[in-house]
């Protein structure tokens, strides 16, 4: 009789207690694309199923505030005004729901306004657009969207810089789409358009999933520690074209860019996967489809020969005609399973502490 009661009690616990997800920083993203969804759902579950998140984040997510923005009229007509309504020192998640339309604004989210989410609809994505250039604002401040705060999230939005493409003659023609300088930022199904320096992936831990990034030269650059999962990297224009310019300056730095299950596309050919803007760049492409637009050498030759020994350019189980390694530069690392796992798990971006899925609204 005693054992029967215990069995009943255990059964009730199974029914009524929700499973808790301890996000695993060690389990790598699987090689098979069909398994990626299950991997994500297992390790990036919603707040109610999670343990180990930062306490400040848990408190912030307890009672989110929702703001509606619509250029045609609503609670706020501009994104800038909506952000101004968030108090300095904010401690609560603020979800800014953006109606479909064009938001011609130069938007900055200050460091003292964490926990902000910009959210659009997947079939009617709002567009943040501006035409700032380095000549007017300085390179990193030319971005249409600048995020300085922590715990930022963007879902289903488009960000553009509509300044003309640099012609190689005009000084200060760099024009950023976005600069992300805050820690713990996630981007889901977002699109970024620019030419040179499209995204300044500046500093902090960042996660991009199912995104699209378009540019010409160094169009993802900075010192961020970022994972790009299932993201299309589309190269346009002509002349020398480079995707990633990671700004690592020493062997001790932990930052770097990891591109996983991405796709490299573009016009023309001769595209470089990355270059040594600084002495110690760290860039890895894993399970990535590389079309014929990729230069057979893969990576741009280093202008400083000493950098041949300090760069970390890794390729792991990539596919497509652009992934052939016969003509790769000699300083490319063909990394093994153990090395690859460091760039394939959430631990690379400290994901178990902060990474949440998009809000279900």
From Swiss-Prot:
A biological-process GO annotation: pollen germination
Location within or outside the cell: Secreted, Cell wall
Residues engaged in binding substrate: 174, 275, 277
UniProt cross-references to InterPro entries, sorted A to Z: Pectin_lyas_fold, Pectin_lyase_fold/virulence, Pectinesterase_cat
Coarse class of the protein's main subcellular location: secreted
Signal peptide stretch: 1-23
One Gene Ontology CC term in the entry: pollen tube
EC number of this enzyme: 3.1.1.11
Active site, renumbered: 197 (proton donor), 218 (nucleophile)
Sites marked Transition state stabilizer: 196
UniProt keyword annotation of Secreted present: yes
Tissue-specific expression: Expressed in mature pollen grains in the anthers and on the stigma. Found in pollen tubes within the style.
An annotated Gene Ontology molecular function: pectinesterase activity
Family of this protein: Belongs to the pectinesterase family.
Protein name: Probable pectinesterase 48
Species the sequence originates in: Arabidopsis thaliana
Gene label: PME48
């Amino acid at each position: 009789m005693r054992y029967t009661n215990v069995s009943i009690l255990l059964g009730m616990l199974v029914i009524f207690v929700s499973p808790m997800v301890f996000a695993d920083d060690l389990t790598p993203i699987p090689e098979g694309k069909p398994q990626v969804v299950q991997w994500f759902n297992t390790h990036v579950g919603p707040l109610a199923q999670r343990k180990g998140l930062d306490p400040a984040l848990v408190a912030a997510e307890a009672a989110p505030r929702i703001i509606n923005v619509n250029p045609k009229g609503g609670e706020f007509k501009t994104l800038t005004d909506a952000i101004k309504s968030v108090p300095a020192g904010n401690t609560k998640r603020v979800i800014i729901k953006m109606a479909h339309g064009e938001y011609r604004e130069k938007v900055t989210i200050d460091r003292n306004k964490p926990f902000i989410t910009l959210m659009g609809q997947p079939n009617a994505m709002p567009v943040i657009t501006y035409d700032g250039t380095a000549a007017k604002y300085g390179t990193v401040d030319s971005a249409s969207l600048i995020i300085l705060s922590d715990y930022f999230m963007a879902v289903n939005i488009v960000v553009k810089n509509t300044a003309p493409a640099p012609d190689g003659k005009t000084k200060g023609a760099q024009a950023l789409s976005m600069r992300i300088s805050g820690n713990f930022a996630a981007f889901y199904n977002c699109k970024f358009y620019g030419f040179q320096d499209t995204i300044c992936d500046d500093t902090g831990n960042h996660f991009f999933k199912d995104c699209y990034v378009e540019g010409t030269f160094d169009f993802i650059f900075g010192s961020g520690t970022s994972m790009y999962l299932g993201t299309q990297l589309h190269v346009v224009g002509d002349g020398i074209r480079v995707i990633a310019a990671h700004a690592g300056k020493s062997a001790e730095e932990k930052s770097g860019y990891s591109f996983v299950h991405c796709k490299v596309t573009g016009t023309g050919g001769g595209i470089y996967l990355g270059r040594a803007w600084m002495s110690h760049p760290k860039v890895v492409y894993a399970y990535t489809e590389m079309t014929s637009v990729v230069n057979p050498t893969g990576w741009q030759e280093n202008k400083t020969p000493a950098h041949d020994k300090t760069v970390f350019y890794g390729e792991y189980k990539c596919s497509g005609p652009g992934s052939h390694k016969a003509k790769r530069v000699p300083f490319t690392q063909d990394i093994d399973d153990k090395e690859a796992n460091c760039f394939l798990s959430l631990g690379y971006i400290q994901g178990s502490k902060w990474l949440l899925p998009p809000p279900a609204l």
